[in-house]
Amino acid sequence: GDVSAVSPHAVAHYDVPGFDKLFDFNRGSKVTGAGFPFYVGDAARLVRALLGFFLDEDAKAGYIEVNPPIFVNAASATATGQLPDKEGQMYETTPDRLFAVPTAEVPLTNFFRDEIVDEAELPIKRCAYTPCFRREAGSHGKDVRGLNRLHQFDKVELLKWVHPSSSYDELDKLRLDAENLLKKLELPYRVLLMCGGDLGFSQSKKYDLEVWAGGQKRWLEVSSCSNFESFQARRAQIRFRSKETGRPELVHTLNGSGLAVPRVLAAIIENNLQADGRVKIPQALVPYFGKEYLAFN
């Protein structure tokens, strides 16, 4: 994307006059703690607009929408690789030992746990919106200011169960589906192919999508698109019966954010800030938001 095309009036979203009226971090901190803001008035409306836009575009791309549980058991979190690797980053309930989902990837992937799916149905494509909950222990500095890093945030997830022979082609298609959202929102972005040192132990290949935040003058990650090959499927025992051999074989699982809302919001605010303090809403979002501008006063 062309980062020079952003507003000449861009400032960091958290420094925009009136930001705290629509994104109330102080009251959120009082009620829950740091990183749990209230979205008030048109801020809440804009979140709802983004989620509706994401889900509608994902449906056009062939993903079937699912509304999943937002708490999962230890078996589900183990199947996707959150346990034991990220146990300290998740919110856990007692005495039931259920975990608040850090991403819809966890309940969605487990949809077919301990099942054999029809090979003819592959690839199976699903999308889901959930609030996501992450402790983010150890985060500090500019990375946590404003909407950059929250303990609770909204995200739409894309997920595919695919035949092993096509999993890398399907990963590229999934990445393009996420890119399509950024293009329609007219946000400058870049695609990073992550090196082995930046992969989780469960991932075989990962792309990160980052948007340019013109006020902060930095790139913000809004999506990671990953191929897990058979790692999650082996833990979850998700298989298909091969027509060629007649035996059950493991599927490959892929997922990616489509997209994470807070940083997309931050980029829209910063890149589209006008001289009068209003924010111009991307044209694709206007039918969902109902207005052409977001005002902070």
Which positions does each model-derived feature cover?
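TRNA-recognition modules of translation machinery and tRNA-sensing kinases, especially anticodon-binding
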Residues: 2-297
